[in-house]
Amino acid sequence: MSLHENHATLATAQAGAHSQWRARLELGFVREGERTTLKHRLHDGPLRVQRPLYPEGYGVCHAVIVHPPGGIAGGDQLAIDVDVGAGAHAVIATPGATKWYKSNGRAAQQCVGVRVGAGGKLDWLPQNNIVFDQANAKLDFSLMLGDGATALGWDATQLGRQAAGERWSEGSLHAVSRIVGADGELLWFERASLAANDSLREAAQGLDGFSAYGTLWAVGAACDDALAEALTAQLGFDESIRAAASCVTSGVLVVRAVSRSMEMLQKALTRCWVQLRPVVHGVQGVPLRIWAT
């Protein structure tokens, strides 16, 4: 499996600066008969995976990634590498929101790389990001798919601690997401670069004043314009939430949403996932138990 940094570099960083964390987590899922097994796990620093669960039967392995510090501060660097082998099906989630703390001028970074082998299936379902005031966050997500692999996933972000009445008035957010097909073709690429004082936050062609936004992506042969239109017809478009689906290329569907409430946005994305899962993976969409805790 690919490594973002070697052990010596990580150890030196942690020993030399206790105020920042560098952490890496590797996960490898394989298909063994009728069972998907978490065969490989390796961690450095404060990233862990809980004991694998099988609420859908042994063919689908659920793994929950935890970050014990509870948030990502300035200077922190987190790297997550996931390999889902041929024919395996992995569901990967987090137990709570990822908090991006005040950075004191230093950027915090999270890099995620996921590979899904031929005929494999992935559900990438982390809970949302919360960007604190004065946070400077960098996020990088890459998904590489083998022949016949299918994938469903999302990413959602709340700017400012809305529940605490805090606005995101200073800081920056840079995010890159890419999905690459079996032949190396770039299926979807998105780059977002946003400063707290950026006029796009209020502009109609930007966030239009909404503080929460998210994207759900689906990759599979069934993802087409008709499916996108059917989803859009069921999504809200008013002063509380605005959402729509589109087929960005053959076999790739994207749902985008903005909302004044992260709870409302997450519910909308969850409904989409429940509807899409049987179509994309051929598996019933049942909300994860961890979402109810």
Swiss-Prot record:
GO cellular component, one term: cytoplasm
InterPro entries the record matches: UreD
Keyword Chaperone in annotation: yes
Localization per record: Cytoplasm
Signal sequence, renumbered to the chain: none
Superkingdom to which the source organism belongs: Bacteria
Keywords: Chaperone, Cytoplasm, Nickel insertion
Function: Required for maturation of urease via the functional incorporation of the urease nickel metallocenter.
HAMAP family linked: UreD
Quaternary structure note: UreD, UreF and UreG form a complex that acts as a GTP-hydrolysis-dependent molecular chaperone, activating the urease apoprotein by helping to assemble the nickel containing metallocenter of UreC. The UreE protein probably delivers the nickel.
Family in the record: Belongs to the UreD family.
Name this protein carries in UniProt: Urease accessory protein UreD
Organism: Paraburkholderia xenovorans (strain LB400)
